[in-house]
Amino acid sequence: MATKTKTQWTCNQCGATAPKWLGQCPGCHNWNSLVEEYVPQARSGTSSRSSTSAIALSSIELENESRIFIDHAGWDRILGGGVVRGSLTLLGGDPGIGKSTLLLQTAERLASQKYKVLYVCGEESVTQTSLRAKRLNISSPLIYLFPETNLDNIKQQIATLEPDILIIDSIQIIFNPTLNSAPGSVAQVREVTYELMQIAKSAQITTFIIGHVTKSGEIAGPRVLEHLVDTVLYFEGNSHANYRMIRSVKNRFGPTNELLILSMHADGLKEVSNPSGLFLQEKTGPTTGSMIIPIIEGSGALLIELQALVSSSPFANPVRKTAGFDPNRFSLLLAVLEKRAQVKLFTMDVFLSITGGLKIIEPAADLGALLAVASSLYNRLLPNNSIVIGEVGLGGEIRHVAHLERRIKEGKLMGFEGAILPEGQISSLPKEIRENFRLQGVKTIKDAIRLLL
């Protein structure tokens, strides 16, 4: 009698499983995200005995050449000082944002250092990929294109070519023929990534994987996909703008939350040497409702413009909208502004926007957001050319922020003359900054509002 094929229902967002179909995923609570997949049968007679033995940590010798430098300052920095041999890097982003372009340029830089690159172009033909390479002036003989989606054929090509670098474009199109599910399904993405990880670690092949993202901006596929790889990078930005951002959210071999800003040109992507200047280049002069705040992105500071608009509301329920700023935190801050500084906003529509399409979550932008709102409401400017730094507590107090010196140095570099900051942190700054940079300390949000009046 033939054995019955077992199936299970797996969430295509988080990878959670259930024995039967459910309308809502029990893991991530998304609706209609469970799909049916076959459960692979365990092989009979397999042994659980390990083929390796434990190794003393002190006896392991590290190679000095364990990292490969891409010869691109920004790329090497965001990867923690070059890419580690045998590592698996996942690059996720929206369609058409430039993921393939970026990795083709990366392949060219690595090939120029005599590394052999295998580029698996599963989504495009060889002709389409070569046309893009020609536009980017890429013609290295050490870059090999392989238009294939079958994992078995890819593994055979890897064994034949023995590349140093492997690029998969993209993971959602590659399939394992031993599984009875469609390419891009939870089971396929999980198993294909696992096998690529095994190949990368055993053969010391540095691997880059391109992944699609969902509507919410997360990499499509099971959450285990991000756990399997060594580095997760998000490629962000507006496809209608000429700049892109790469943000590291996971890195086993370096720091996380690093940010790399690139500009799109006819011949590919190039690093922006002065990111603060990029986001402030269209600011013509002092404007009510506008504040400049320094935020920390990875190991560097970045100046951005925060704009607020306050107008009378014709409706009983005023509108509160944000772009690039957490709306829940903004509602909380407006409540603090009304309660602690007696700024009446209950009949006003309030809008807040981060210019350039950036998204910020750090609390050091609190004070800048509230001063921008007050500036728009009272139609008053800050008296000096200053940046604004500070977290606002529920009691209206201005709280300390991290990396204050780094933020102020970035403001000084960009030509600003002073800063509004927590009063209690002024004494911790170096003497040079205290003497050569105008510092205005504030204890409460009410003190900060007085600077406008």
Swiss-Prot record:
Q: What is its EC number?
A: 3.6.4.-
EC class = hydrolase
Please list the GO biological process terms of this entry: recombinational repair
Is Metal-binding a UniProt keyword of this protein? yes
This protein is called DNA repair protein RadA
Its GO CC terms are:
cytosol
The protein's GO terms of the molecular function aspect are: ATP binding; ATP hydrolysis activity; ATP-dependent DNA damage sensor activity; damaged DNA binding; zinc ion binding
Q: What does the record give as the function of this protein? A: DNA-dependent ATPase involved in processing of recombination intermediates, plays a role in repairing DNA breaks. Stimulates the branch migration of RecA-mediated strand transfer reactions, allowing the 3' invading strand to extend heteroduplex DNA faster. Binds ssDNA in the presence of ADP but not other nucleotides, has ATPase activity that is stimulated by ssDNA and various branched DNA structures, but inhibited by SSB. Does not have RecA's homology-searching function.
Q: Where is this motif: RadA KNRFG motif?
A: 250-254
The family classification in the record reads: Belongs to the RecA family. RadA subfamily.
Check the record and name the PROSITE patterns matching this protein.
RECA_2 (PS50162)
Q: Which SMART domains match?
A: AAA
Q: Where is this region: Lon-protease-like?
A: 349-453
Residues annotated as binding ATP: 93-100
Q: Which UniProt keywords apply?
A: ATP-binding, DNA damage, DNA repair, DNA-binding, Hydrolase, Metal-binding, Nucleotide-binding, Stress response, Zinc, Zinc-finger
Coiled-coil residues:
none
Q: Where are the zinc fingers (C4-type)?
A: 11-28
Note what the entry says on domains: Has a putative N-terminal zinc-finger, a middle region with homology to RecA with ATPase motifs including the RadA KNRFG motif, while the C-terminus is homologous to Lon protease.
